[in-house]
Amino acid sequence: MRGYLNSNYKEVKRSINELDPSISSNLLNPDAIFANNEMSLEDIEVYGFDYDYTLAFYSKHLHTLIFNTARDILINEHRYPKEIQRYEYDPNFAIRGLHYDVHKALLMKIDSFHYIQLGTVYRGLNVVPDSEVIEMYEGSHVPLEQMSDFYGKSSEGNTMKQFMDIFSLPEMTLLCCVNEYFLKNNIDYEPVHLYKDVKEAIRDVHVKGILYRAVEADIERYICYGERTQAVLSKLSNHGKKMFLITNSPSSFVNKGMNFIVGKDWRDLFDVVIVQADKPNFFNDKRRPFRKVAERGILLWDKIHHLEKGQTYKQGNLFEFLKLTGWRGSKVLYFGDHIYSDLADLTLKHGWRTGAIIPELKSEIEIMNTSHYIKTMAWLQGLTGLLERMQVYRDAESQMVLQDWIKERQETRDLTKTMFNRQFGSIFRTDHNPTYFLRRLSRFADIYMESLSSLLNYDLHHTFYPKRTPLQHELPVCSEQQYANTFRIPLGRETAPIK
């Protein structure tokens, strides 16, 4: 029986090594727009945008600034040991979408079924052995009542916090660095206090204006020049589309950034500009009225009866916004990078169409397009298929072979994980399952893309169609990949610039 199993193994291995070269010519376009829900740009009359990581993209220096400033706040204001100052920001440590167990001080990746991906649980800067994780959680499943709340936050009864926005990468890294220092030096500490102190320090970097002043003082260092952003806004304006901006950032910060990215006449492109909106409260709290922001940031006390083009408004709420503009339902498309704060309420409660900006998408697709990744994934699928078919052989000799295959399968999984991030892998997958992050992305975003510049690849009559993937009980009659191979069509490359 061992010989029969090995011959099947070798046959699958041979077929993988002889993969049709045409597969390498049918790669995904990193600049494409991907659809979770069918949507036509022809139906969109109004385009809305967040500012940070949607219109404005930041350099790597910004996360270092946030990390260093928050670390120093812990030392100077919360009396943390000065020795933590030796820790520096590592941009390759954390990824977006991770969960943090506030009471256990553990950072981890969780899949769409609430299962922890073993091998991605970190205490400090070191991975926790799988056996210890299973003992702590009595398995690898996290019950619903322990998960983060609707907006990814840790609240009463929820012991998990999910880090969803790009600004959270320094926060995760700082949490793990301070944890690491305490553990290495055998210092007894309360994990809840550490979490709250780091959270407050990170918040102070924003709320006290430290980040805003630093960026405004050296805008070329921190903001990536937005020539493509300017092109997108200009094209939409030339096609007669209404546009608005709703951001949590302050007026002077947005103004300086947009002057740099678009030009001093940037307000001429927008019909409505709202700053310090306090999303997601902006979408739910009816009590806060708009205030007009005059020159030099002076707030006027006039009652707002109209939202005027060329003016800037602070706070307010979506219900008043809808009343004053009449922009309702599926004719509005809003873009943001934060799945919860920017998109969730809009799609669930107000019927707006939503677009998620996922900067990590491009680098992940570029990895998936490599021949090494393609062959590794093909072998992983082939090996999994072998295990599924050959598990019926229960004799001792066959089971020894199967155990070797199971071990190799896990090693191959670990290899694919490290291709994206050595600690946590892809932000979209936990082994074979989607991540919790992707589950929320799929639910709250009609379309998603690496940046707004992807819109330049499509005309404004384009309809985005989600790929039909067979359900587990459905027969895969003809996949898109097979169709593309048949007609030699490069996937995701059938795009035309806006004219």
Swiss-Prot record:
EC number per UniProt: 3.1.3.-
Keyword Nucleotidyltransferase attributed: no
Pfam families: 5_nucleotid
Residues noted as binding substrate in the record, renumbered to the chain: K199, E200, A201, I202, R203, D204, V205, H206, V207
Domain of life, source organism: Eukaryota
Residues reported to bind Mg(2+): D50, D52, D337
NCBIfam families named among the record's database cross-references: HAD-IG-Ncltidse
Name of the protein this chain belongs to: 5'-nucleotidase domain-containing protein 3
Species: Xenopus laevis
Name of the coding gene: nt5dc3
